[in-house]
Amino acid sequence: MSESNELIEQRIQKIEELKKQGINPYPVRFFPDSKSKDIAEKFEKNPTGPETKFKLGGRLHSKRVMGKASFAHLKDNSGIIQLYATKDDLGETQYSIFKSLDLGDIIGLEGYLFKTQKGEITLHVTSVELLSKCIRPLPVVKEKDGVVYDAFADVEQRYRMRYVDLIVNDHVRDTFITRSKIVSEIRSFLTQEGFLEVETPMMQPIAGGAAARPFVTHHNTLDMQLFLRIAPELYLKRLIVGGMDRVFELNRNFRNEGISTKHNPEFTMMEAYMAFGDMSTMLDLTERLITHLAQKICGTLKIQYGKDLIDLSPPWKRTTYVDIIKEYSGIDFSQIISLEEAKKKASELKVDVSKCQTIWKVADEVFSEKAEPNLIQPIFITDYPKELSPLAKSNPDKPGYVERFEPYVAGREIGNAFTELNDPFDQKERFEDQVKQREAGDDEAFMMDEDYIRALEYGMPPTGGLGIGIDRLVMLLTNSHSIRDTILFPLMRPE
């Protein structure tokens, strides 16, 4: 029997022993009235005596049994506090229970505070109760020379068993607490800007709003094929048509694509649409929102991301899509007239463009490989090719291009925005072009959406739209270097 299995058997045996004593190892309820951090801070300012009792609940973090007295530490979701328990205070039965506790056990305690001779605030335990047994031993975390070592260092295992990861790694829990604050702050900011939060379908008869492969499902009663949404965009713009002038949705999207440090098939997106807005109003909104979040969450506009100090102070740099590709690859795609020439130049840079069917698809691969990783400081990339932007309004001053921008920071895209195309005739032509690309083998090309065309035929005001990837934004604001570090339960291969 392995050491781990032997420990599990020992802990199960302890449960059986408690049952024989008539003690329920999984009692129905226990109501703490305090948090360890709160009572310690208050005690430091205003010490209390044995007459002031506190009830705490949490996990046993450490334990030292010394005959008739024991020291231990309790960890709750606010912090860690030292415990002092004696046989005289607890009595034979409860002290026996206390001594038999294992690290990780969830316990309920009552007691009063005092300071040890070393000055550590400690809970003098007067009552103890096992609330839930930790049957499986927790990984042991150790620190040496500022580096943390534990038996849970395998990243894949941490993602797969996030519940254990959260128990043993405080920084992981802190990341997800920060994520929650970011999401709440986004909602608050947009609400103050006059946006109304709405919900649109997760299952859609047509996968639209983005260039991506969808997940396919089937509705049995209606006998119809449905897609998990790849984006909410076309439904949100239907609401603009309906007179809801400022709307946003913060929810999940699903794309049947690869997994990487920047991609997870299930991810969170915020999309906002503003009637009588355009690319410039959404650019201003993006800059204000992200700088607001940085100041609110990080307390500064200069944040450390890996080895880079990123300065989010406005105004952010701006440059065009064509110019940024030329800067980092030497290729001016605006001057290339044949697909063969585009592929040749890309291949010389060792960029795989074998599946690209158009010049601008080649350009986009070159951008992703050569330019994007270098965009560390915040920058808005503007003036995208019309071909790559089937839902964006054409730029009247630059034929072949659209009023679109994408914000980049820390070497990755964190959003996408444009002046929305509201001409139903132009939109139908672009959908038709996308259908041709789809028929030619591009399974990420858009599908035709006749109902959306019909909605535009009722008239949509000039509109600005914005999408921001929440997971990537959280990566930036928490100094996380994989998207899976910002998603509680990322998709994993089967064990």
Swiss-Prot record:
Recorded catalytic activity of this chain's protein: tRNA(Lys) + L-lysine + ATP = L-lysyl-tRNA(Lys) + AMP + diphosphate
Entry annotated with the keyword RNA-binding: no
One Pfam assignment: tRNA_anti-codon
Residues bound to Mg(2+) 2: E413
Major location category of this protein: cytoplasm
Positions of Mg(2+) 1 binding: E406, E413
Cellular-component GO terms for this entry: cytosol
Annotated GO biological process: lysyl-tRNA aminoacylation
Manner of cofactor binding, per the entry note: Binds 3 Mg(2+) ions per subunit.
Annotated GO MF terms: ATP binding; lysine-tRNA ligase activity; magnesium ion binding; tRNA binding
UniProt entry keywords in alphabetical sequence: Aminoacyl-tRNA synthetase, ATP-binding, Cytoplasm, Ligase, Magnesium, Metal-binding, Nucleotide-binding, Protein biosynthesis
Cofactor(s) required for function per UniProt: Mg(2+)
InterPro entries in the record: Aa-tRNA-synt_II, aa-tRNA-synth_II, aa-tRNA-synth_II/BPL/LPL, Lys-tRNA-ligase_II, Lys-tRNA-ligase_II_bac/euk, Lys-tRNA-ligase_II_N, Lys-tRNA-synth_II_C, NA-bd_OB-fold
Subcellular location: Cytoplasm
Keyword Metal-binding: yes
EC number of the protein: 6.1.1.6
Subunit and interaction comment: Homodimer.
PANTHER family: LYSINE--TRNA LIGASE, CHLOROPLASTIC_MITOCHONDRIAL, LYSYL-TRNA SYNTHETASE
Family note: Belongs to the class-II aminoacyl-tRNA synthetase family.
Protein name: Lysine--tRNA ligase
Protein source organism: Leptospira interrogans serogroup Icterohaemorrhagiae serovar copenhageni (strain Fiocruz L1-130)
Lineage, opening ranks: Bacteria, Pseudomonadati, Spirochaetota, Spirochaetia, Leptospirales
Gene name, Swiss-Prot/TrEMBL: lysS
